[in-house]
């Protein structure tokens, strides 16, 4: 049954970028406004030029649920530094946020030594 008050979710991210020190935890804040209520939330990140789903089965990530749509990333490393997008779906459709960039500050430096000997 159609209702003029039914739309895909409106998904917003609090900031256009976040910064975290290497090894620390960061939460990318996502809010969802939805009528009818949203039934799922998921995140994607840019990896190799493609949007890929964030692997929520990994203990590195938490959140990304209907009740807690924000994404928390633990033990951040250089692989986490990229763009992220939050998505939410209801029976009408899927909405997505604008992208946010996570900057991981510091981290491991790979040193290579070359010898002419």
Predicted feature residues:
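Proline-centered linker/hinge motifs at extracellular inter-domain junctions
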Residues: 6-11, 15-16, 36, 106-109
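Extracellular beta-strand/loop-rich beta-sandwich domains predominantly from IgSF
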Residues: 17-18, 58-92
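Core motif of extracellular immunoglobulin-like domains
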Residues: 30, 43-45, 86
């Amino acid at each position: 049954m159609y209702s003029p008050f039914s739309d895909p979710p409106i998904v917003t991210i609090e900031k256009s970028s976040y910064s975290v020190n290497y090894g620390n935890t960061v939460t990318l804040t996502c809010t969802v406004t939805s009528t009818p209520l949203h039934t799922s939330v998921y995140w994607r990140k840019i990896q190799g030029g493609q949007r890929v789903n964030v692997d929520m089965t990994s203990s590195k990530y938490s959140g990304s649920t209907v009740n807690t749509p924000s994404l928390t990333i633990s033990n951040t490393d250089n692989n986490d530094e990229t763009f992220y997008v939050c998505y939410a779906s209801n029976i009408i459709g899927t909405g997505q946020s604008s992208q946010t960039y996570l900057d991981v500050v510091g981290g491991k430096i790979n040193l290579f030594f070359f010898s002419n000997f």
